[in-house]
Regions:
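Amphipathic alpha-helical polymerization modules
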Residues: 1-261
Length: 261
């Protein structure tokens, strides 16, 4: 029964983790360019394999039950979501799965800056005229420098080539970076941005799909995400119920069946 408690407890832990992941996805179904996280599950080996006991105390029957489950590393779904028209001249939606906008993120505690990537293409000028995301991160040009918009040159807009147009002239270029195998080289890092797991492996994209006056919608589907969360909740509750049943059986085995008359 103790072994059964261990198996059920592992199921509770894994499914509550999945609940947290799906809850975060559900909270971001309206976030521009959001990419959903996908929890992973891996089989845990039986106790006799994971922690071999001396003198051959393995139990063949228990080994057949397995060792429960572990939470595996989470992955991110980078599939491009449908674009949505906004009519805003500085909005831009990327349509390729592996392209991103480069932004400069400043640590508020240390002042250190880091280049990160985002799919959120809702841009606007800040008080200094620099092009920023809705979270205040500086949008970078192909030279990794911030883009400044001169208000004296007229209204600015982004064209399909990622150029900032004022009047009839291109005054700047938005950096569009391509990342090979983004699922393994990028990790979510808050504020709808992605950081590199290791080396900065982005490449300047020379050809890419970009829709002006659009934004990419969230990659999290409200219906499917809600169904996933419900399934994880049911699985967690089922394992918790098994823990209660086994606890009751242990109580009776010790206090009732094991009572000495």
């Amino acid at each position: 029964m103790y072994y059964g408690l261990s198996l059920s407890a592992s199921g509770v832990l894994v499914n509550t983790t999945s609940q947290d992941v799906y809850a975060n996805n559900l909270a971001n179904v309206e976030t521009i360019g959001f990419k959903p996280m996908m929890p992973g599950v891996q089989q845990r080996p039986p106790e006799s394999q994971e922690d071999p006991a001396p003198f051959g105390t393995a139990n063949e029957l228990l080994d057949k039950l397995g060792g429960g489950v572990f939470s595996a590393p989470m992955t991110t779904g980078f599939k491009a979501a449908p674009p949505e028209s906004t009519g805003r001249p500085l909005d831009a939606a990327l349509t390729d799965n592996d392209t991103f906008f480069a932004v400069r993120v400043t640590d508020p505690n240390t002042g250190d800056t880091t280049t990160k990537l985002t799919r959120s293409g809702r841009f606007l000028p800040n008080s200094q005229g620099q092009l920023v995301t809705t979270t205040g991160h500086l949008v970078l040009n192909p030279s990794d420098q911030p883009i400044t918009i001169d208000p004296h040159l007229g209204n600015a807009r982004i064209d399909a080539a990622g150029r900032i147009i004022q009047g009839q002239e291109a005054v700047a270029q938005v950096q569009v970076a391509r990342v090979p195998d983004a699922a393994t080289t990028l990790r979510p890092d808050g504020d709808n941005t992605f950081a590199f797991r290791g080396q900065d492996n982005r490449q300047q994209a020379t050809a890419f799909g970009l829709l002006p006056k659009h934004v990419e919608t969230s990659g999290a589907s409200p219906i499917s995400t809600l169904n996933q969360m419900i399934a994880a909740t049911k699985a967690a509750n089922g394992n918790a119920s098994m823990i209660r049943y086994q606890d009751t059986m242990m109580d009776r085995a010790i206090n009732t069946l094991g009572r000495v008359a």
